[in-house]
């Protein structure tokens, strides 16, 4: 219950910040263009707080924090006194109106740059992209990539950490091939490798794109030695103790801890014969994994043990931290990468290269907000930057109810020398609203199906 409330609070704070930034962009440019702003509202519904400034603008914080708006003087909406017509939105030039409309998304992009600038000033801990292992017959194996190598770049984009690698990989979904630069760890002798992506299939919301290529990142070393056996668990009932080393499972030599995890997961309620070592003494025990439900008509095995973990050596860790000026460039570059990724993913949703079930809605965003806030300020800022970029790009989509739709009408007006008829605009708004509701419905359906 507390985690739900925490996620909800982090989501509301994030939404409030991003909506305020977006609407302030519209507000600020409207004021600079001489448009009278009547109301600046964060949220919808009943006003919880309101204040009016000297220029007659009413500032409102409303009950429902799921949006916001800037109400400008406009003769198309209501009658305007003759002495105020020059302050009406509809009486401004096409370029001025386009500037006002596009200012919201631009504000979101600028906010992302500021957020990442703070991240890089504070410093973000990360792990260098060193390969721990390569899965046999995988895409990476076929490209002759081997363990111990460090991924230096993906299609020319530098990858100083695993997050950068994943960001670059996701944008390549649907491509036929990809170039990666690799070098032995600690070396700058970079070799370019070509990966054949025609058989590369994975679901971004469920799978790691790195692992889907057959690359297993170098991480903390997990030994097949038990650090803890939970009381009352299947492992304790089988006689396992902390300090036991698992050597074989059903007669097969255990090469890595993950193999044991998969054996337990895939055999709920089924006996597994374990050969173990306890203080150098060989023993044989039978483990019957407990059964836990993980969805409709699906269950997994659960043993109730924790393995011994040897932390990752310091030479594999890094902190991305820069001075004030370098951080500006890095923040801009990171924001540009996110913008390209968002546009690419939206395009691939349309072409079918990415399945529609990868679309996320407010529940997934709330979960992400709560999780990032738990990790700390740096990760919450990174989350805000990501959502801010997404909000900016989506608002530029040419749907009439979005900023992009308004820009489309203004472009048509500029080309034809007159505004689009109100009848056409009204019809377009209806169609756009229906499409937006359908998309939101699909996103919510995907959210609930992931719970």
Curated annotation (Swiss-Prot):
Keyword Transmembrane part of the UniProt annotation: yes
Biological process terms in GO annotation: proteolysis
Transmembrane segments: 98-120, 377-399, 427-446
Membrane topology: Multi-pass membrane protein
Location in or out of the cell: Cell inner membrane
Main location: membrane
Keywords: Cell inner membrane, Cell membrane, Hydrolase, Membrane, Metal-binding, Metalloprotease, Protease, Repeat, Transmembrane, Transmembrane helix, Zinc
UniProt cross-references to Gene3D superfamilies, sorted A to Z: 2.30.42.10
Enzyme Commission designation: 3.4.24.-
Domain PDZ residue range list: 115-186, 199-280
Cystine pairings recorded for this chain: none
One Gene Ontology molecular-function label: metalloendopeptidase activity
Cofactor(s) needed: Zn(2+)
PANTHER family: MEMBRANE METALLOPROTEASE ARASP2, CHLOROPLASTIC-RELATED, REGULATOR OF SIGMA-E PROTEASE RSEP
Function: A site-2 regulated intramembrane protease (S2P) that cleaves the peptide bond between 'Ala-108' and 'Cys-109' in the transmembrane region of RseA. Part of a regulated intramembrane proteolysis (RIP) cascade. Acts on DegS-cleaved RseA to release the cytoplasmic domain of RseA. This provides the cell with sigma-E (RpoE) activity through the proteolysis of RseA.
Domain notes: The 2 circularly premutated PDZ domains act to negatively regulate protease action on intact RseA.
Similarity-based family: Belongs to the peptidase M50B family.
Misc remark: Regulated intramembrane proteolysis (RIP) occurs when an extracytoplasmic signal triggers a concerted proteolytic cascade to transmit information and elicit cellular responses. A membrane-spanning regulatory substrate protein is first cut extracytoplasmically (site-1 protease, S1P), then within the membrane itself (site-2 protease, S2P, this enzyme), while cytoplasmic proteases finish degrading the regulatory protein, liberating the effector protein.
NCBIfam families: PRK10779.1, RIP metalloprotease RseP
Protein name, as recorded: Protease RseP
Species in which this protein is naturally found: Yersinia pestis
Gene assigned in the entry: rseP
